[in-house]
């Protein structure tokens, strides 16, 4: 079966695993997903991740983070730019997520960065998702 939006699949797997209180979730790996996991780890939304090599494309294992081992750190993770409707913003049009409590992850010419980093660097890009 062909997957039309692998990023949305990754975000959905992370959201569902958090609600089910799983400690880890396995996702088919790609360079974009590894970059996305790197940003999520740097912002403190996940504990860690690792890429497990297999004979195919590899598996990205994401270790989730919880507050007091009960509530997931990620309250909401939402896909913004979709294959049927891309959302691009300039550096001066990037909005804060939940008044700065959350982050928007952008795909820019400098790679995947958060909304704050994109504003500081003065670059815009495609808004992949928001997390808070």
From Swiss-Prot:
SUPFAM superfamilies: Ribosomal protein S8. One of its GO terms (molecular function) is rRNA binding. GO terms for biological process: translation. GO terms for cellular component: ribonucleoprotein complex; ribosome. Disulfide bonds: none annotated. Gene3D superfamilies: 3.30.1370.30, 3.30.1490.10. It holds the Pfam family Ribosomal_S8. Belongs to the universal ribosomal protein uS8 family. Part of the 30S ribosomal subunit. Contacts proteins S5 and S12. One of the primary rRNA binding proteins, it binds directly to 16S rRNA central domain where it helps coordinate assembly of the platform of the 30S subunit. PANTHER family: 40S RIBOSOMAL PROTEIN S15A (PTHR11758). This is Small ribosomal subunit protein uS8.
